[in-house]
Swiss-Prot record:
Keyword field contains Coiled coil: yes
Record flagged with keyword Coiled coil: yes
Entry-linked InterPro entries: UPF0662
Localisation per UniProt entry: Cytoplasm; Nucleus
Protein's recorded name: CUB1 family protein C30C2.08
Assigned keywords, A-Z: Coiled coil, Cytoplasm, Nucleus
Record organism: Schizosaccharomyces pombe (strain 972 / ATCC 24843) (Fission yeast)
Source domain of life: Eukaryota
Coiled-coil intervals: 119-174, 418-448
Family: Belongs to the CUB1 family.
Length: 457
């Protein structure tokens, strides 16, 4: 289960709903684990219909101020997993596909607010993503098969993200324009220190170099420790910038003397285990960003999100506690690892193409052909028509897979992503024609140059 919150008593009238949700989640999990075949979209649609039925029942039996129970946790688990299935079958623009995206954006915004170490550049892509989701919800709600309860649920989740974004935006909008450059630089240094704390031996000269940068920023303050404008008037945003600067000095000392983990963290097997789990998750997600086009089924991300949610739920008032119930110093590194893991999940979700996994192999091959042709074009073009033969043969072999202009699945159904794949195919043919035309033009210019030279002789 992805959500790990204290269980509240489930009302008697919601018990049947809980049992149904547990059953749906188990079937989704079984489908997720089955790697022997491609995911069939009709199975996903059927499970979605069953889930919507339970959402309608729950919505009809609840008031707006109902206490959150395990029913909500099970529902969110089902919705997040269902959302990943929609991405896996290429239905990226259908409403259920946005549940997991909204959940990830919310997490990132919460971590930004908690750490108070972010810039406008961090918020901008999240805001753009929220606006795209908002537009998709509006468009999706107009369709005949749109479920009102799904639209309502998505709008509620969107509203939470909007509130978090507004708070995050308000916090940095108070920074004076003259201080924005310093704040941006401090945030960058802070993240470099966090990264170094995780890999303390990766750059032996990092500590001295970073200390010099921090001292340089420290010297920009006046004798009263304030960042001021040309008229010696203290700039707005002092507290935020000074807070980040002090944290940078403190964390750099920790990284210098304690190799990333504080003594208190090192003395707690429980916290060391959390650290190593997060570090392992980060490395796996980082690897996925390099290989996902060929190896990732979007539903695989559920396991990572579940692990992160479990770890995050261990915090009490934002702090991880050791075996004695104390919150040791030096926990910033754990928050950094959590945030980085969610950032990689967000990156993987954002890069998901609206193509069914049945078509993904063809899609990836066409992307590779296109990338190779573009590289040939950038490198000066072809030397002869023969240079194009391998690309033409590859395109021909892929085109031969089509039946009546469609790429079919093993059961002869038409998988999602036809337009995108056919568009890539067309682009590859256009690039071949461009390369051929460029070669032809080059030959003409070369002949004309040769004739002019002969004439002058």
């Amino acid at each position: 289960m992805m959500s790990y919150e204290p269980a509240e008593p489930v009302p008697v009238e919601e018990q049947p709903i809980l049992e149904k949700l547990i059953g749906i989640r188990q079937r989704l999990a079984v489908l997720k684990r089955d790697r022997t075949r491609f995911i069939e979209k009709n199975e996903v649609f059927h499970l979605k219909d069953e889930l919507v039925e339970q959402m309608n029942l729950l919505d009809s039996r609840r008031s707006t101020n109902s206490t959150r129970t395990i029913v909500d946790s099970q529902l969110e688990d089902c919705l997040h997993l269902l959302s990943l299935f929609y991405l896996a079958i290429g239905r990226n623009n259908d409403l259920p596909a946005f549940f997991v995206q909204l959940g990830t954006v919310r997490r990132l915004l919460e971590y930004n607010l908690e750490g108070a170490c972010y810039t406008q550049n961090d918020l901008k892509p999240l805001k753009e993503r929220l606006e795209r989701i908002r537009a998709a919800i509006v468009e999706g709600s107009k369709k005949e098969d749109a479920s009102p309860v799904v639209v309502k649920y998505l709008n509620n989740k969107l509203a939470v993200c909007d509130r978090n974004y507004s708070e995050a935006q308000h916090n940095i909008s108070k920074i004076s324009p003259e201080l924005i450059g310093i704040q941006t630089r401090l945030v960058s240094i802070h993240r470099q220190i966090d990264g170094f704390a995780v890999r303390p031996t990766s750059d032996p000269g990092f500590i001295d170099r970073t200390m010099e940068q921090l001292k340089e920023i420290e010297e920009m303050k006046d004798s009263n420790g304030m960042f001021c404008d040309a008229d010696h008037v203290p700039l707005q945003g002092q507290e935020l910038c000074n807070g980040i600067l002090e944290e940078c000095f403190s964390f750099l000392e920790d990284a210098k003397t304690k190799e990333g983990l504080s003594d208190e963290m090192k003395s707690s097997p429980k916290l060391q285990q959390i650290y190593h789990r997060l570090d392992e998750l980060l490395n796996k997600l980082k690897h996925l960003t390099l290989t996902h086009r060929w190896t990732l089924r979007e539903t695989d991300l559920y396991v990572y999100r579940a692990s992160l949610a479990e770890i995050d739920s261990m915090r009490i008032d934002g702090q991880f506690l050791d075996e004695q119930g104390n919150a040791p110093a030096g926990q910033r590194i754990l928050l950094y690892l959590l945030r980085r893991c969610y950032a990689y999940i967000y990156q993987l979700l954002s890069s998901s193409e609206p193509v069914s996994e049945e078509l993904m192999a063809v899609h990836n091959q066409l992307r590779t052909v296109k990338r190779c042709l573009l590289e040939v074009q950038r490198s000066g073009g072809i030397c002869s028509e023969r240079d194009l033969y391998p690309y033409q043969m590859k395109l021909a072999s892929l085109e031969n897979l089509r039946v009546n202009g469609k790429f079919l699945a093993s059961d002869h159904s038409v998988p999602e992503g036809q337009e995108l794949v056919n568009s890539l195919l067309t682009q590859c043919h256009q690039l071949i024609e461009e390369l051929r035309d460029e070669k032809h033009q080059h030959d003409i210019e070369e002949r004309e140059g040769s004739e002019n030279t002969d004439g002058n002789l």
